[in-house]
Design a protein with these regions (language model features):
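Solvent-exposed beta-strand/loop surfaces, strongest in extracytoplasmic domains of secreted
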Residues: 15, 787-881
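Carbohydrate-active catalytic/glycan-binding domains of CAZyme proteins
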Residues: 432-433, 457-788
């Protein structure tokens, strides 16, 4: 959330701000004055005065002559922030006119007035969007329903700053109040000589912006008075509620003179210019080594800034031409550095700031320009500039530069096998812990060398799940006030033809940078699956007056790990300086280079200084691993003198297929497909033409198509199973996106399908992206709780000999059939070990020497993430270390019992025996595998009681010698 800087007309605050900033990088020079300026208030005719500075409650005090009986009421106060600088309406989210915060003003606010002045301070939130009204006075049969309007007087900043008096708009076409800065606005309406019409004049910072002398709606709006009077709310319930701050709102029952309007704005202009001067930040001015981009406007109050240099041989100010076509070209401070070994040079940059017609502030900043770097300085500066992004959340390959801006060679080393010295990342498996590593950069130039370490945290892989739903990012179109912002929708079931908008057609993301428009959003999922990068065109056709005025080399970048929470917008320059635009950017993961290719349409100016003579449209590209650092742009498709734009791409097997628009003009434009095994091949003749006219052969032969989307249907898709989808934006004859399916990616004509959109704001979305997603992702996006997943454990263990380790494997399965990860704890007796699952299984070795006989082992899956705990237990036999069979029989000789012990070697090894009985012991030196030895023991008795004997069976020698003792019970024996 962007908060307005403190700027209200309280001079002490300004002085503190100016003084504090002056200590940093320069000084603010005010015009000489003998004393503090005096700003007399204008109170003559001030009927309603709402300072809007209450810090609590819902009453908005009226300190004008109308008094407390005409106080206002803050409605929906939980959606407002109150403070000494005004009421901040809807700082956190969007709302319609009824549910958002607004002030209800008293009825009949301007009753009986033949002239009126409305005067206030305003800070418009950069997130403000859509049809809205800043203030409005109306007469309606019911304020909270559409229709029934009997007259209205209101102001808005939609498309342009305007005041509407009945059917007349007082406006200067396409001039809007700048957002994120404080402005003073005044509207006066005075009767003309004929007594039946009025002249309305609109001022910003005391300077006239627009005027109309043909107004037929009186300041009183309606003879019956007004019953729907608001601050921050529209007369139309379905409009947006205003987002921004209003302060010091005044209504006079007369038209202030031009001099009075200037006087009303004077204090804010003076203090605003000083605050803008104090807020200028040129960075490290004590060591400037590259050209500086100098601001044109103040960041607090929007003052216009011009620049001069005391020494152009050190810092030359290069101001772009005043032509409208070049208005986006920045002012540059071009640096000339002293030669190696020379003294540092200095120059004073002077910024002159003007706000309104009379307020001027001056800021002087000393710029120190070091001499050309020697080797040591070059290395130190490259080390200072070297940075890596998101090092605590690594989820893909890392961009590791090998060359510094100042000529250093950079060599990298890694402390971990999980990240290579060239930045390729191998992530731990799902369910495994994150890995910490250190990347060490050694920067060297000549004999100078320095090292810089970066600690990184490599996150484990996400859970693999099957895609069962779809996600759509799109924009609505340039014909509506909120149409060029990003909207989201999700499929209804596993069907890429049936959709519901997430926010009822309201934007999910609003641009606050560049042109403050977001068109053509494209979303790419990382190859590991848990990072989403969204890029969009920096263009606001509706507010800026059409695409032809676009002159930006930037794209807008957002990043997410869940398609719900997005990083703040990044305004990223990708196109070269002489490009007139960077339209419809898309990206694709290119496995062969381990990075993303980012590609866009652009034209190059024939005259890059004045920004005139736009050439043919081409496709250019660069590469990136993180959408933070991009390679230098390169030509990808240049069909000169023809034009191409809007490429989308998909890889099928070993081939890359791209679908592109040929810019033949209106209905002659169509989309066509090509293929190549080398995605970055810039020889357009090396690409094989597959289908030359996909749009007009698939949908309507007389229409033009652009903005293609191509993607593979999910398994189980109910509309086009086992096929590919192709969407094309029919920008002529209306219609928006048209859809088609085909099993053959190389089909010349596809099967047309119908897209159904609900709560999307338009019947058909415009140029965007369809992204296959999992059911759990779909639930999270829609705000549906995801249930945890039950698991089961299956144990596999075989019987073992007492001298052998027992191998145990646990297989864990999830109830939903998708990937499992985490730890399994094995327990057998007093032994325990915990191991991680690998591909759904965990194996351990129970050490040998377990007691012979039946044993049990338990495997406990400890649960992980969404996976619930489970366990299982299994039994196994621990067999003797040496395998043998022992039998006991008896026979009688001469009336005496003979005990016969038979031992068989069941082992694979040769064994020795020691047979011990109550009647003696007999050793057997060697018994081959499979052989049997019988030993006879004479008892010398006619009968013997039951008893026990043992046979010790040994195998191996030395430390490898093992022995098993077989104990055999025998019954009583008798020869009688």
């Amino acid at each position: 959330m962007v908060s307005p800087p403190t700027i209200r007309t309280r001079r002490a605050r300004w002085v503190v701000l100016v003084a504090a900033s002056s200590l940093c990088i320069g000084s603010v020079v005010a015009a000489p004055a003998s004393a503090e300026p005096v700003y007399p208030d204008i109170t003559d005719g001030l009927v309603h005065h709402f300072e809007l500075n209450e810090t609590s409650g819902t009453v908005v005090a009226n300190t004008g002559t109308a008094g407390a009986g005409a106080d206002g009421i803050l409605v929906n106060p939980d959606r407002a922030a109150r403070g000494a600088d005004g009421i901040r309406f809807n700082p956190d989210d969007y709302a319609d006119a009824l549910s958002g915060a607004y002030v209800r003003l008293p009825d009949d606010l301007t009753a009986g007035m033949q002239a009126v002045t409305v005067d206030y301070d305003i800070w418009i939130d950069p997130a403000n969007v859509g049809e809205h009204q800043i203030w409005s006075l109306g007469n309606k049969t019911s304020c909270d329903v559409a229709g029934g309007q009997q007259g209205q007087l209101f102001s808005s900043n939609t498309q342009r700053l305007r005041v509407a008096a009945g059917t007349v708009n007082v406006q200067q076409n396409r001039v809007r109040l700048p957002e994120g800065v404080w402005k003073h606005v005044t509207y006066t309406q005075s009767p003309n000589a004929n007594g039946t019409t009025w002249t309305g004049t609109l001022f910003v910072d005391g300077v006239q912006q627009a005027q109309s002398a043909t107004i037929t709606t009186a300041p009183s709006v309606n003879a019956a008075g007004t019953n729907c009077n608001f601050l921050g709310r529209s007369q139309v319930p379905g409009n947006y509620s205003f987002r921004g701050t209003l302060s010091d709102f005044r209504v006079y029952d007369r038209s202030l003179s031009g001099a009075e309007v200037v006087a009303r704005a004077a204090q804010g202009n003076d203090e605003g210019a000083e605050a803008d001067a104090a807020a200028i930040d040129l960075g490290l001015t004590s060591a400037v080594v590259e050209d500086i981009e100098l601001p044109k406007l103040g960041t607090v109050a929007g003052s216009a800034i011009t620049w001069e240099s005391s020494d152009p041989s050190v810092v030359e100010v290069v101001t772009p031409p005043s032509a409208t076509s070049a208005r986006k070209v920045p002012i540059l401070g071009v640096i000339t550095r002293p030669a190696l070994g020379a003294d540092d040079a200095t120059a004073i940059l002077t910024a002159t700031l003007r706000k309104g017609s009379e307020s001027v502030a001056v800021r002087e900043m000393t710029i120190t320009v070091p001499a050309e770097f020697d080797e040591a300085h070059s290395v130190d500066r490259d080390a200072l500039d070297l940075e890596l992004h998101s090092t605590d959340n690594v989820r893909g390959n890392i961009e590791l530069p090998n060359q510094g801006r100042w000529g250093s060679t950079i060599v990298w080393e890694s402390s971990s096998e999980y990240v290579s010295s060239s930045g390729e990342v191998t992530r731990p498996a799902y369910g495994h812990p994150e890995v910490e590593a250190t990347l060490t950069a050694t920067l060297a130039k000549g004999g100078a060398e320095v090292q810089k370490n970066f600690d990184v945290v490599i996150k484990p892989l996400p859970r693999e799940e099957e895609n069962e739903r779809y996600f759509l990012g799109y924009f609505k179109g340039e014909g509506m006030a909120d149409g060029e912002q990003i909207m989201f929708a999700t499929s209804n079931g596993n069907n890429a033809l049936d959709w519901t908008g997430l926010t009822g057609g309201w934007p999910s993301l609003v641009s606050q940078l560049g042109d403050q428009g977001l068109r053509d959003p494209h979303i790419v999922r990382s190859p590991d699956g848990d990072t989403f990068y969204m890029i969009a065109t920096d263009l606001n056709w509706y507010d800026q007056g059409g695409y032809a005025i676009n002159d930006t080399q930037y794209i807008e970048v957002f990043e997410s790990n869940d398609l719900v929470n997005w990083t703040p917008q990044r305004h990223v320059k990708v196109a070269p300086d002489d490009a007139g635009n960077a339209f419809a950017p898309e990206s694709l993961w290119v496995e062969e280079i381990g990075a993303y290719a980012v590609f866009w349409a652009q034209s190059l100016w024939n005259d890059p200084v004045n920004r005139t003579g736009q050439g043919n449209a081409q496709m250019w590209y660069n590469t990136t691993r993180d959408f933070q650092t991009f390679s230098e742009p390169k030509v990808w498709q240049n069909p000169a003198p023809q034009s191409r734009i809007d490429t989308t791409a998909i890889k099928v097997g070993d081939e890359y297929y791209r679908v592109t628009k040929n810019e033949a003009g209106n209905a002659g434009s169509d989309i066509f497909s090509e293929k190549n095994a080398d995605f970055l091949d810039s020889d357009i003749n090396a690409w094989e033409l597959v289908a030359p006219a996909l749009g007009r052969t698939t949908w309507q032969s007389t229409a033009g198509y652009e903005g293609p989307v191509i993607f593979e249907a999910n398994a189980g898709d109910t509309a086009c199973p086992g096929q590919f989808y192709l969407w094309g934006d029919r920008y002529t004859n209306g219609g928006g996106y048209q859809a088609a399916c085909e099993a053959n990616i190389e089909a010349q004509t596809w099967q047309a399908k119908t897209i159904t959109m609900t709560n999307a704001g338009v019947p058909r979305p415009r140029h965007g992206t369809v992204l296959p997603i999992t059911l759990r992702e779909w639930n999270s996006i829609r705000g549906i709780p995801n249930e945890d997943v039950a698991t089961t454990v299956d144990i596999a263990v075989d019987d073992v000999r007492a001298d052998q380790d027992a191998e145990v494997t646990a297989t864990v399965a999830a109830e939903d059939g998708f990937e499992v990860g985490g730890e399994v704890r094995f327990t057998a007796g007093d032994w325990s070990e915990t191991v991680y699952l690998e591909d759904g299984t965990a194996s351990v070795t129970i050490p040998a020497r377990l007691p012979e006989g039946e044993q049990s082992v338990k495997a406990e899956f400890l649960g992980f993430d969404i996976l619930l705990e489970s366990e299982a237990e299994a039994s196994f036999q621990v067999l003797p270390a040496v395998a043998a069979s022992v039998a006991v029989t008896d026979r009688c000789v001469a009336g005496r019992v003979l005990l016969v012990v038979t031992a068989t070697n069941d082992d694979e090894r040769k064994v020795s025996l020691l047979i011990e009985t109550p009647f003696g012991a007999k050793p057997v030196g060697a018994l081959a595998s499979g052989k049997t030895h019988a030993a006879v023991f004479t008892t010398r008795a006619a009968s013997i009681p039951s008893g026990t004997l043992t046979v010790a069976v040994a195998a191996g020698d030395g430390s490898d010698r093992v022995q098993s003792v077989y104990t055999v019970d025998y019954g009583a024996m008798s020869c009688s």
